From Swiss-Prot:
Alphabetized GO MF terms: naringenin-chalcone synthase activity
SUPFAM superfamilies (UniProt xref): Thiolase-like
Reactions accelerated catalytically: (E)-4-coumaroyl-CoA + 3 malonyl-CoA + 3 H(+) = 2',4,4',6'-tetrahydroxychalcone + 3 CO2 + 4 CoA
Pathway the protein acts in: Secondary metabolite biosynthesis; flavonoid biosynthesis
Official protein name in the record: Chalcone synthase 4-1
Family statement: Belongs to the thiolase-like superfamily. Chalcone/stilbene synthases family.
A Gene Ontology biological process term: polyketide biosynthetic process
CDD domains referenced in this protein's UniProt entry, alphabetically: CHS_like (cd00831)
Length: 389
């Protein structure tokens, strides 16, 4: 008779979880940051708020963002005036948009990832779908299963309302699934659409205005599995270790609430300070077992909540400016796409590493870290090992 331990051993993969493919997608509507304040105050009928517009212009100028992509066009906003007001009842209108657009954009990214992976989609065993943009039942995971034509018995995980740290969360979950289910191939999708958070400006809630200056739309998809099939599946990064922690004394630092007016966004404390104060501890826990204490010797993928977070992390750890190059590039070209951001940065890094003729997918280095920061304040840490190019 076979023992339980023998069954468990047979169920487990041998090698670490690997990222085998990455695909990204954005809406076609591109918004230039330099002209966005004019558009935003005009479309929200707020041009009379001259001082507030000047504040918003300064926020946009300091954001280090050149452009963003948004589902919400001028035409859509004119058809939905309640979305343009500050805190007007508008949840129905927003939901009607995102329950369609979130899985649609997710599909676009997933198709690219599946194509790069090179295997038939029938070999996908698990699906993780993550969004902070709206809620529905059955969820966006179900809708994507239908849109892609996946098998009905794919094991699905739907993550709603996690926020900006969730790019790390989906990797942590995918790692556990891949390593504990021999032969598993996990499709991971993060899809974010700002139609839930867009609203007009308010003199009394400048934290809401910060969100209007930073957030953009995007979807990213990965294929994750252990023990890649030689000559067929090509690993990009290996996931070695993961952790999640709530930063001490950070309650209320970042909040989001789904209300009749959509998803409200609140920054209540010194978020960059909290992140930079706690990052050292997270790094020691992650890299001490590897005997790594020089954080300039590893590659960096950090959720770009905004330039202030990146600046303070660099200063706290004494990082060289080039360490955050891929992170800052994605922030500049796409804005803050919440959970999808770090997956875009993974894609940016492996592509630029190959273009530069470097020896590994991680800017020529062997070890790296991926950080997600978000509501809680929650910090996700993923230790990555690069792959030879």
């Amino acid at each position: 008779m076979v023992s339980v331990s023998e069954i468990r051993q047979a169920q487990r993969a041998e090698g670490p979880a690997t990222i085998m493919a990455i695909g990204t997608a954005n809406p076609s509507n591109c918004v230039e940051q330099s002209t966005y304040p004019d558009f935003y105050f005009k479309i929200t009928n707020s041009e009379h708020k001259v001082e507030l517009k000047e504040k918003f212009q300064r926020m946009c100028d300091k954001s280090m963002i050149k452009r963003r992509y948004m589902y919400l066009t001028e035409e859509i906003l004119k058809e939905n005036p309640s979305v343009c007001e500050y805190m007007a009842p508008s949840l129905d209108a927003r939901q009607d948009m995102v329950v369609v657009e979130v899985p649609r954009l997710g599909k676009e990214a997933a198709v690219k990832a599946i194509k790069e992976w090179g295997q038939p989609k029938s070999k996908i065993t698990h699906l993780i779908f993550c969004t902070t943009s709206g809620v529905d039942m059955p969820g966006a995971d179900y809708q994507l299963t239908k849109l892609l034509g996946l098998r009905p018995y794919v094991k699905r995980y739907m993550m709603y309302q996690q926020g900006c740290f969730a790019g790390g969360t989906v990797l942590r979950l995918a790692k556990d699934l891949a390593e504990n289910n021999k032969g598993a191939r996990v499709l991971v999708v993060c899809s974010e659409v700002t139609a839930v958070t867009f609203r007009g400006p308010s003199d009394t809630h400048l934290d809401s205005l910060v969100g209007q200056a930073l957030f953009g739309d995007g979807a990213a998809a990965l294929i994750v599995g252990s023990d890649p099939i030689p000559e067929i599946e090509k690993p990009i990064f290996e996931m070695v270790w993961t952790a999640q922690t709530i930063a001490p004394d950070s309650e209320g630092a970042i909040d989001g609430h789904l209300v009749e007016a959509g998803l409200t966004f609140h920054l209540l404390k010194d978020v960059p300070g909290i992140v930079s104060k706690n990052i050292d501890k997270a790094l020691i826990e992650a890299f001490q077992p590897l005997n790594i204490s020089d954080y300039n010797s590893i590659f960096w993928i950090a959720h770009p909540g905004g330039p202030a977070i990146l600046d303070q992390v660099e200063e706290k750890l004494g990082l060289k400016p080039e360490k955050m190059k891929a992170t800052r590039e994605v922030l500049s070209e796409y804005g803050n796409m919440s959970s999808a951001c770090v997956l875009f940065i993974l894609d940016e890094m492996r592509k630029k590493s190959a273009q530069a003729g470097l020896k590994t997918t991680g800017e020529g280095l062997d070890w790296g870290v991926l950080f997600g920061f978000g509501p809680g304040l929650t910090i996700e840490t993923v230790v990555l090992h690069s792959v030879a190019i």
